[in-house]
Amino acid sequence: MRTVLLWAGLLAMSGCATKPEAGAPPRESLKAVVESLAGEATRLSPGTDLSLAVMDLRTGETASVSGLEPHISASSAKVFWVAAALGQRDLATVTPLAEKVFRTSDNEASGEVIDLVGGPDAINVYLRGLGLEHTALTKWNYGRERWATNSPRVMGRDNYFCADDMVSFLARLDRRELLEPEPTAQLLKWMELTPREGCGGWLGTRLPVSARASLQHKGGWLPPGCCGDDARYNVLNEVGLVTLPDGGRYAVAILASRGPDWPKQAFFVERASCVLYRHLAKDAALDCGEALARAGGPAPIVLEPGAPAPNYDCE
């Protein structure tokens, strides 16, 4: 059974904090919500390997499930690489590449961003400097071959990260601890160039319109049929910063992989994003696909023997 960890707990609150109404049931903790979602994943997307981490940036309350488990990072890691480039190069140099990275997840532009930093080894030095010990760039061969000599290769030839590392990074980005004010603001704006919903925008699909519009995120996907071994890949990651109605924000990483049914895995990620928002926004009326969840998620995809998988790439 997965272990659910409460990293930081609640920061000290002022003595004038609003008290719950007399007789009202105690509010469910973020830890309990995350634990419930982990249980749902086994029912809604059997076979999916899930890691999830979330931090309420208003209070510091943070919970995770399998938060240190390594996952293939796919394109979600590109936010690390652009941040590293902004720490070394001026905005004018980074901007043309970063806009492609976030607008269309351009892989060749991402390789050029890695080159701006000094190559894969330099990216890993940057990550270690931030204390992200469970994240590494191993190779990036778009445009040309790039191999790291200092990757621990925890996942063989694949690039990887973990949910806890990503949420830690996003929280520090939001607190303006990683970069100077101007590049920080620009990186956050670039994170709004990504899809708002649907393929590549799973984090926003079931959020209210206002939250979807202001969403700052980066999806990463390696869908069935893309990479030669669906049992290893079928990667669907979403990482980002979400704004709540009171102006507060939270950082979230939902990492799902290896699920044999892509639509079921995608539905779970969309629903998990919505359920977390509903809890943190205290919006009990928000529909996170309840009827579909009660039905077990989307109908299973059944393929004839030898038939190719549907094209689930974001084109």
Language model region names:
Residues 17-19:
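Bacterial signal peptide processing site
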Residues 25-50, 55-59, 114-315:
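Penicillin-recognizing serine hydrolase domain
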Residues 13-15:
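C-terminal motif of bacterial Sec signal peptides marking the signal peptidase cleavage site
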Residues 87-100, 105, 120-123, 180-183:
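Short, well-structured active-site flanking segments
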Residues 6-10:
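Hydrophobic helical h-region of N-terminal Sec-dependent signal peptides
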Residues 1-4:
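Positively charged n-region of N-terminal signal peptides that target proteins for export
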Residues 60, 70-92, 101, 252:
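Active-site SXXK
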Residues 64-71, 152-155:
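A short glycine/serine-rich beta->alpha loop
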